[in-house]
Amino acid sequence: MTESAPSAFFTTSTPADHVHEEESSNTGYFENLPENDIHSFFEIDATSEWIKQGNHQRIALQFPDSLLPYSEKVTKLIESRFRSESAKKTFVLADTSYRSCCVDEVAAAHADCTALVHFGEACHSAPTDKIDVKYVLGSMPIFIDQFRMEFQNVADQLTAEHIVLLMDSCFSHEQEKVAAVIKEVLPGNRHVECSLLPSEDVLKQNRQNIYLGREIPSCLRNNQPTDLIFCGFPNSPLLPIWLLSYPSCSTVSHFNPINKTIQHESTRSSRLLRKRLFLVEKLKDADTVGLVVGSVGVDKHREAVKRMREMCKKAGKKIYVISVGKINVPKLSNFSTDIDVFVLLSCPFGVVLDSSDYFRPVVSYFEAEIALNPAKTWAADFGWSAEFAAFLEDKIETEVPDDKAAGDFSLISGKVRVQKTEEEKNGDGPSSVAIYNPGYCNDRTWKGLNDGVSTAEDSTKMGEGRSGIAQGYSGK
């Protein structure tokens, strides 16, 4: 067991906050896989059979950065199973449009693929029905002996009656062995539950009691005090999202398969949830909302955009829909003078848990639902969710007080938020269109990203550019 300052797995940042560092700390763990392990890790036989059964002719193979070095070998192994079928073609997808945990159906569509094999960690968001998808999560050893040795050092600190075991996808095949060790080591008769990964067929047919692609243990559904045992990478997006969603997990013991140590600490979910409630108040105070589309491969994202437009309209707020691919601070800073609060529409692993580096607050779809839909209430406790599809069918109510000047009290500014009248809403409201001319940014002191070449004398007038081809433009 190791002791440290607030451990990395309690960070308020997810890979969405550091897109360039998304898998850097995990990459070395997957290096130098033996030849036999490549076949089993990438499920070559099962994948080939899936392609055969579906009679797919154009197949996209999507790899995260950590597994990209194996893409050529995996592609050749799969193609070798179909040498007699010249019509079958495979395409390697990397550097995905949004996040590597999501199905990149946009890139697959560019290659006119009818099937996609997703390798590596996945958020398990329900994909759209435009393409057939197979998930290959990989299988890595969890080092049972080292886990037993480390867990014996922290077992006495687990005091809750209920114990939940949660694992990153690539270790989930070891779940039963790890659960057996936990039951063996824990003193007394404790109730140990595993958050299992259901089969793909189950996920397609019924997602009830499923969260982040995993079955929700009964103790968490009933909000009972629970100790969490997590086996996964230090920068796993799964753990911080899970702890916010289930604050009844009072402590967490994190087994790191890289250095084979366990860290045990109390969670800070309640404090972090109160920060999310602060963001709800910021959105209530906002006049202009920017809906940032952070994924188009998740089912019902179009319905989510439509619902957000409707909620903003009823709340009397302007809304702009923005798509910038992978989000970062410089990209959103370009819109910070026009937008008061950004709402990020993304998969669960893409939720920004710490927006302190951004010029404007970045909230999740759940917080937007609480802020803009009077039918919803939330007190920074149980019920926070990173999955926007969970409440798309809920009713949107409109608060219309008898006195149109009446409003509610802002907990941030200390002022009363006045309910806008129908005339005010219809005058220059959410449905209005802002027209930007080429000189739109001229009067601003800050104009966004600067390449270091532009000058104050740069003209916004259109002129004739160069002609020709790259080999020799005119005027060279």
From Swiss-Prot:
Biased segments, Polar residues type: 1-15
GO CC terms, sorted: 2-(3-amino-3-carboxypropyl)histidine synthase complex
MF terms (GO), sorted A to Z: 2-(3-amino-3-carboxypropyl)histidine synthase activity; 4 iron, 4 sulfur cluster binding; metal ion binding
UniProt-annotated stretches for the region Disordered: 1-24, 451-476
Pathway(s) annotated for this protein in UniProt: Protein modification; peptidyl-diphthamide biosynthesis
Matches recorded under Pfam families: Diphthamide_syn
Cofactor note: Binds 1 [4Fe-4S] cluster per subunit. The cluster facilitates the reduction of the catalytic iron-sulfur cluster in the dph-1 subunit.
InterPro entries hit by this protein: DHP2, DPH1/DPH2, DPH1/DPH2_1, DPH1/DPH2_3
GO biological process, one term: protein histidyl modification to diphthamide
Intrachain S-S bonds: none
Keyword Iron-sulfur: yes
Key words, A-Z: Iron, Iron-sulfur, Metal-binding
Signal peptide extent: none
Binding site for [4Fe-4S] cluster: 102, 123, 347
Subunit structure: Component of the 2-(3-amino-3-carboxypropyl)histidine synthase complex composed of dph-1, dph-2, dph-3 and a NADH-dependent reductase.
Described function: Required for the first step of diphthamide biosynthesis, a post-translational modification of histidine which occurs in elongation factor 2. Dph-1 and dph-2 transfer a 3-amino-3-carboxypropyl (ACP) group from S-adenosyl-L-methionine (SAM) to a histidine residue, the reaction is assisted by a reduction system comprising dph-3 and a NADH-dependent reductase. Facilitates the reduction of the catalytic iron-sulfur cluster found in the dph-1 subunit.
Record family assignment: Belongs to the DPH1/DPH2 family. DPH2 subfamily.
Protein name, per record: 2-(3-amino-3-carboxypropyl)histidine synthase subunit 2
Organism annotation: Caenorhabditis elegans
